[in-house]
Amino acid sequence: MLNIHDILGNDDENLLSYQCKHITKDKLTLPSHDFVDKVFGLSDRNNRVLRSLQTMFSHGRLANSGYLSILPVDQGIEHSAGASFAINPIYFDPENIVKLAIESGCSAVASTYGTLSLLSRKYAHKIPFMLKLNHNELLSYPTKYHQIFFTQVEAAYSMGAVAVGATVYFGSETSNEEIVAVSNAFAKARSLGLATVLWCYLRNPAFVANGVDYHTAADLTGQADHLGATLGADIVKQKLPTCQGGFKAINFGKTDERVYSELSSNHPIDLCRYQVLNSYCGKVGLINSGGPSGKNDFTEAARTAVINKRAGGMGLILGRKAFQRPLSEGIQLLNLVQDIYLDPNITIA
């Protein structure tokens, strides 16, 4: 078993001992073994949605912990198949995607219609399926950013999936139509008993100002999470925040100085906690993404997991860091992340 203290290195004390003083943990609904009963059992979700949610929370190495570890592989569309899989060509074969999720003990596997439909009869009863409904295909020229539907909610129901996922590019020129399309799709999904997960991403060239990329600012991503929760998502997926003050730097929208002085700080756990706060104080689970693969994947994945867990988040949805390496290493990396959520010594800040 890898040692978390060695992996975090110089960040060890800063991340593992920090205590949030702005938004304290008692103000949040935190992940727990009875989260579905405690939160969604009081909602308008029908019994089949509750069963679908509980199926994910009861599967894999994190079963009955209240946390989720999801393997997402839609990068063949979002980043092109060559760019995603050339480093590890076995994943051009979609069966290896599902095998990685199963062998690493993930809570669910999220992928495209082509991948999951091809394998559903063999695997839908062995690991929870999450069908990603829309994508930004990368073959248009010039490159544009517009989430379009590749399949329908009914396909998820037919293949035995327990959840659907979708993306909205909040802040983009097409965000309004994406919001309407996703709202309609999620309503249909709920009627069929499927859980809903929203990738709440920001996309606008104006969000890069004075050399700073505010696509990952806590105030902007927090508002995106809040919009996702408002759309009725059961879980929101968001990038880990890296900065603060997007509204002020870009000089748009509305904010309040207390967001920066009383509700957050520059500490990474406080920045992530502001995302949790916007996710209905944790009642809509926040899962953070793992980001691209690089030289320090184990350290970065561990760091993201510690920040998410200690902030009050619900888990990680980590793809490229896992599948852009040999299968055994991908399993080891995913298990490292899962071990952090299972470790009772890594507590809520």
UniProtKB/Swiss-Prot annotation:
<dbReference type="GO" id="GO:0004332">
    <property type="term" value="F:fructose-bisphosphate aldolase activity"/>
</dbReference>
<keyword id="KW-0456">Lyase</keyword>
<dbReference type="GO" id="GO:0005737">
    <property type="term" value="C:cytoplasm"/>
</dbReference>
<dbReference type="InterPro" id="IPR041720">
    <property type="entry name" value="FbaB-like"/>
</dbReference>
<dbReference type="InterPro" id="IPR002915">
    <property type="entry name" value="DeoC/FbaB/LacD_aldolase"/>
</dbReference>
<keyword id="KW-0704">Schiff base</keyword>
<dbReference type="GO" id="GO:0006096">
    <property type="term" value="P:glycolytic process"/>
</dbReference>
<keyword id="KW-0324">Glycolysis</keyword>
<feature type="active site" description="Schiff-base intermediate with dihydroxyacetone-P">
    <location>
        <position position="237"/>
    </location>
</feature>
<comment type="similarity">
    <text>Belongs to the DeoC/FbaB aldolase family. FbaB subfamily.</text>
</comment>
<dbReference type="InterPro" id="IPR013785">
    <property type="entry name" value="Aldolase_TIM"/>
</dbReference>
<protein>
    <recommendedName>
        <fullName>Probable fructose-bisphosphate aldolase class 1</fullName>
        <ecNumber>4.1.2.13</ecNumber>
    </recommendedName>
</protein>
<dbReference type="Pfam" id="PF01791">
    <property type="entry name" value="DeoC"/>
</dbReference>
<dbReference type="InterPro" id="IPR050456">
    <property type="entry name" value="DeoC/FbaB_aldolase"/>
</dbReference>
<keyword id="KW-0963">Cytoplasm</keyword>
